[in-house]
A protein has these predicted regions:
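Aromatic-enriched hydrophobic runs in primary sequence
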Residues: 6, 13, 52-55, 83, ...
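C-terminal catalytic subdomain
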Residues: 7-95
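Acidic, glycine-enriched catalytic cores built around paired aspartates
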Residues: 88-153
Length: 153
């Protein structure tokens, strides 16, 4: 659910390609553009950039999810992992972001954190909506399939 608020559509996941400057990991770094979360600036101008969302994101939903997750971490004294340095695309310690909507759905269903930060009916609604969207996509025949299998003959 949290990741779906940052990457809401099937097409959202196609940007997460190594070397694309779209993050492929749920890591953070200091002034590191290969990180999903980047601590940037100095002194009074320091800020956190969430580099995961694309132009298709609902900013209200994304901010709500990020704020809820952050508050949960603060209230429960969760330990922040060390920042990753260098090219995070090649860092084997970094946790990968979901590569598809289907993967995001499966992670949301297994999550122990999401039920703690979202009401059950909200979480259920977003998972159901994502499953419906994935199901509709799975039934569609796209241009690649036409070109590959139909027009080839």
């Amino acid at each position: 659910m949290l990741f779906r608020s940052l990457a809401p559509n099937i097409n959202s996941y196609k940007r997460f390609q190594e070397g694309s400057f779209a993050p492929t990991t749920a890591a953070w770094g200091i002034d590191n553009r290969t990180a999903g979360f980047r601590l940037a600036g100095h002194g009074g101008s320091i800020r956190i950039e969430c580099r995961v969302p694309g132009a298709d994101v609902n900013p209200y939903l994304a901010f709500a999810g990020l704020i809820q997750a952050g508050l949960y971490g603060i209230e429960n004294n969760l330990e922040l992992e060390d920042p990753l340095m260098g090219n995070i695309y090649q860092n084997k310690k970094a946790k990968s972001v979901p590569g598809t909507l289907r993967e995001a759905i499966n992670l949301a269903k297994k999550s122990k954190l999401l039920p703690k930060i979202f009401q059950a009916d909200v979480l259920e609604h977003y998972i159901h909506a994502a499953e419906w969207e994935q199901s509709e996509y799975d039934k569609s025949v796209n241009d690649w399939e036409h070109q590959r299998y139909f027009e080839r003959g």
